[in-house]
Structures are given as C-alpha cells and as structure tokens.
Amino acid sequence: MPGPGDPDGRGHAVVWVTSGKVCVSLTVRKIQTASAAHIHRGTAGTAGPVVVDLAAPSDGTSYSCTRVDRGLAREVARTPAQFYVNVHNAEHPAGAVRGQLHR
C-alpha cells in the first residue's frame, strides 16, 4: 500500500456487483472518523484513480450502492484484484485503511 496509513486501523468490506451497480458494506475500527471512502483502480502496492464513490463509515460502518457504467461493473466483478477500497480521514487523507478486492 502506498503511504503508511493508520498502523492501528482495521477494516472489512463486502462488495456486491450487479449489472450497473456496485454495493459495499464497510466496517472500520481504530481510526479517526472517516471522511470519505472509494473504490480505486489499482493493483496491490500501487495508487490509482477513484472509480466508485462510497458512503464514508463515519460512525464505523456504512452501506452504499452506486450506479456505475456496466463495463466498470463487469471489470470489478471479473478482475477484482485490479481494484481496492480506501477509507480516508483527516489524519490520513491519502488513506487510513486500504484493502485489495478479491473473490
């Protein structure tokens, strides 16, 4: 993961992909209040652009469904290792916790 993030931070994401929609349930702990969360395009160890905005788990949990291009939904479903979830906060604006998607 680029950058140190929050060394105490922990998180868990469950991602569902349907035709034209990405849904994510997020849980984080041991970090300051989350201010943003996204799915980024990028393999392990690289930083990449935001491709899906998510609800920030500001109280530790969040659930969101975002409409996306069907092609992107297909990509996330077929090649999850090409994407990661990143949760941001004021202390770690580049990302407090990050997790690579996998099946």
PLM-predicted stretches and their roles:
Residues M1-A37, R41-R103:
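Metal-centered catalytic cores of metalloenzymes
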